[in-house]
């Protein structure tokens, strides 16, 4: 991958080229419609309106019977890899001969004489003395009409990043029209086909200026590709494939993994790479690095330095050998002060010797954790104290905090209201054992101190459930066959107090039956004696592990990263770059495909970080497929529908939501953000679609939504809950869901990872020992009775697992310096339309107001789930942030 470091000046002086040209599309301007008005009425073929700087998209003049030519200067702002300074070679020769960038200007209008596209204006752009610029001067007939597109052919032997192209008529800067490019342009030696860039004026398909209709369709065909051959680095082809590249059976037969995206293992689709299949398994694709993603989906230089599979992998590969002599790969920490030492004393890092060049690599990748010992030249791997531990080092041990985090922690999207009792499994009892839960009426009512019956508590909406029983139970025996790990199915019931806080009543752990053993299940409560109290703490550790694993595999990876990739692919394949919906969604897709490719390369792959350190081991991603098949629905990805579906909210007669838990920080702040996004989407759709008929008649939009359903989420294509994209209301809901998932939902489940899981006893990723009372073996019970704290520590992740996860979460929780936050930057196409610009400014203003509202909520002592002694305030849905690990900020996209 080539990363940008310094902008390079590439420029030249080109001779005038006498050809037809004129200009349509400009920054902060409104187009005349390129031969039509915005309503679709044709303009006179003999008159080209002279637009103002505020409203015009094109530069134009009144044409009389005598044809005249205008001089148009094209200024290209470019940025190319810094390696060009070292080895320019053939490109220097090309520059000397004037062949650098070939520009072609495409008229929005057809030639009235022939009814065909006007002849294009061509000219070479050459280096100038100004850094990073090319310039061309072209002679353009006044009758050329508005420019609807610029074609660019890169004559260099290397790709080039072009930021924008500015067209100036007659040397008058006030006529400047900017084509926003922000794209890599391949060398013609890689692909002779020039790139096409359209005006910032957005057009529905039916409103496309006739001169660029064919080009609009051709561009989409190019982006779709032909579905054959292996993709190359410079290409921009978007296509679908199954998750068949997680395994590596040619390297190790134990690394064979099932294909996800089949009838047996349903899954969203990923971007096709076309790599050959492995020798051992014809269904598995060979692995390679880097993994192909379309060129413009790749990281910027700044982002690439912040996170990539290479940096992550090299950082961990440097850490592990460096600390291996000091840590035990299979043992846990012997006492809690040893865990605390990770944040105070740290682990010595050798500069040479056992760790090789470990210090330099680690310092480059995760500099936050490398610190110098005072008055020495030695360095240590010392983790930052997570905010939760900084505020209250014992909070993780308390039941109140355990419950509070289900509403305001890392995974606040899984708790449900208990609406049916008794609790019964939906799994086959012939396979897994009796379906009835061990959480009986007697146990729950006892833990409620007889205040009310279970039925009364359910009626008053006081009972809530965290249910990881049916999703994990089928994997219990398989996971237990893996070394040094165990698994149960679990259920936890909570009671809503009069103060609006939750308290856990009971936990159920279940082991399914097997050919040699009956089902085992038991309900645990915090009890009134030491033994029951410690068993309760062990049971909580198992539940926290289940919640942590489900969070990472489903709430985070599946519901954001994996499910969004099909939207990105379909958007690029079916919506033109000049389609208003494309331009609305594009900022929400930044970096996601590259992040997902890197995750397949280093995080979720066979023997990757997730498999090595999380509860389900090699079954982890397969388990996310089970969750996708059983529970994922597009319609309930809408925050209000999700809350209603989980019984956490009801819709009143006035349409507003009423929460079952008044102080539910994720829901409170989330609805604030959701409402802002929906209003922005509604204002945007209202501008471009005047009626439901406009939506239903949009052929690109229809093809886009059809492809999302039938190709991107093909394993769910026949589900009845898919909305139909045929009305403005439905379109607004669809767009709001996509924008919410990529922004608010992802921010809520990602950027608090180090704050809450950086201290791993609070969010263990794996439990390595069965709870002692399962087998009731004398030796285990004797050890438990003598040293219960030691049993807990031996159950938690090993020293090496903990270090690996902590280092990974430090990287994954961080905002890049080039992060783009929602509501912060307007796209050039939005600025080109005054009404859209005004709508965006209102959207941005609402998000700024949300910052203050969230601060007030966090400072209100009545909100006990987000304000109190030692409590981490809920800031994950505050829209803006500084770079680094901050625990706040909503980027536009899934960028990490």
UniProtKB/Swiss-Prot annotation:
Pfam families tied to this protein: Lipoxygenase, PLAT
Cofactor note: Binds 1 Fe cation per subunit. Iron is tightly bound.
Domain PLAT: 80-199
Reaction equation(s) it catalyzes: (9Z,12Z)-octadecadienoate + O2 = (13S)-hydroperoxy-(9Z,11E)-octadecadienoate; (9Z,12Z,15Z)-octadecatrienoate + O2 = (13S)-hydroperoxy-(9Z,11E,15Z)-octadecatrienoate
Disordered as annotated region, ranges: 249-289
CDD domains: PLAT_LH2 (cd01751)
GO CC terms: chloroplast
Key words, A-Z: Chloroplast, Dioxygenase, Fatty acid biosynthesis, Fatty acid metabolism, Iron, Lipid biosynthesis, Lipid metabolism, Metal-binding, Oxidoreductase, Oxylipin biosynthesis, Plastid, Transit peptide
Identification of the protein by name: Lipoxygenase 2.3, chloroplastic
Gene: LOX2.3
